[in-house]
Amino acid sequence: MADLRSTFLNVYSVLKSELLHDPAFEFSPDSRQWLDRMLDYNVPGGKLNRGLSVIDSYRLLKDGHELNDDEIFLASALGWCIEWLQAYFLVLDDIMDNSHTRRGQPCWFRVPKVGMIAANDGVLLRNHIPRILKKHFRGKPYYADLLDLFNEVEFQTASGQMIDLITTLEGEKDLSKYTLSLHRRIVQYKTAYYSFYLPVACALLMVGENLDNHIDVKNILVDMGTYFQVQDDYLDCFGAPETIGKIGTDIEDFKCSWLVVKALELSNDEQKKVLYDNYGKPDPANVAKVKALYDELNLQGVFTEYESKSYEKLVTSIEAHPSKAVQALLKSFLGKIYKRQK
């Protein structure tokens, strides 16, 4: 796996070099240096799970056959396209959320001399994806499907982000809107499609499959993405900041988090009043009251039960799939996220 990771990182260097010498634009030394630094700061710094899972998925769909160098390169290039998409979302997301840290370092727009140039950097990151696809996939029979896939998933993610942002609008904060179905909608569109479905869809296209024949796989992956986001919501409050690489602010930010939805479900009127009075306020005293209520309601125990039930349900869905290769792929995904701490 360490070897796969280093191979994957080598492909990043190749793609970055191609983008820094893209013939469609005449770079000056300053602009090339800016882009070089911007890419290194934002693209390769995460866990790389989404990108690496394209290679894993492709290998499993080929029944575990060893991939040749060309196949590894192409699967890696698609994996990096997803990492580029992720970088684009995060750079802009951090501006919108006025965040401070990301992956254990200051958000890009917080770096001296960057500021709002980060907005254009986000647009550039998004535009690098079709450049990479054109250079390496233009002759492939699935090229148009790849372009369609990335466009559709980006649309779904941006639309999920919209629901997330408008539910947290200043002056329109209304906890009574926060339900499990709203939470699921935000998660499905904002996270599940690009984090879970997209890597597998890329691998399916590479092995010549038609995505319309794999709606069941998409549904299982969206369920997995929902489970992943519930873990994220849980870790935002109960995870160790040094482990997760960021300081959680869901309570201050009035996020439609799984925790607040469950708290609303389980609270009596008095406890609901504590939530209504304190949720979405930046003062640490208000945040502490919400966290104390979460403890009072034993949300850690409620989460543990949710985690085991979700796991069982996902395993049952996966084992109902007719293809052993697809089962292996989905189980490997689930194995990576079950009981994760970061």
From Swiss-Prot:
Superkingdom of this protein's organism: Eukaryota
Cofactor requirement: Mg(2+)
UniProt-annotated binding residues for dimethylallyl diphosphate: R102, K190, T191, Q229, K246, K255
Pathway entry: Isoprenoid biosynthesis; farnesyl diphosphate biosynthesis; farnesyl diphosphate from geranyl diphosphate and isopentenyl diphosphate: step 1/1; Isoprenoid biosynthesis; geranyl diphosphate biosynthesis; geranyl diphosphate from dimethylallyl diphosphate and isopentenyl diphosphate: step 1/1
Record keyword Phosphoprotein present: no
Cofactor info, note text: Binds 2 Mg(2+) ions per subunit.
Protein's cellular compartments: Cytoplasm
Family annotation (PROSITE patterns): POLYPRENYL_SYNTHASE_1, POLYPRENYL_SYNTHASE_2
Region forming the signal peptide: none
Family of the protein in this entry: Belongs to the FPP/GGPP synthase family.
GO cellular component: cytoplasm
InterPro entries listed in its UniProt record: FPS1-like, Isoprenoid_synthase_dom_sf, Polyprenyl_synt, Polyprenyl_synt_CS
Protein name: Farnesyl pyrophosphate synthase 1
Positions contributing to Mg(2+) 2 binding: D93, D97
Residues that bind Mg(2+) 1: D93, D97
Binding site for isopentenyl diphosphate: K47, R50, Q86, R103
Role this protein plays: Catalyzes the sequential condensation of isopentenyl pyrophosphate with the allylic pyrophosphates, dimethylallyl pyrophosphate, and then with the resultant geranylpyrophosphate to the ultimate product farnesyl pyrophosphate.
Organism (species): Lupinus albus
EC number(s) stated in the UniProt entry for this protein: 2.5.1.10, 2.5.1.1
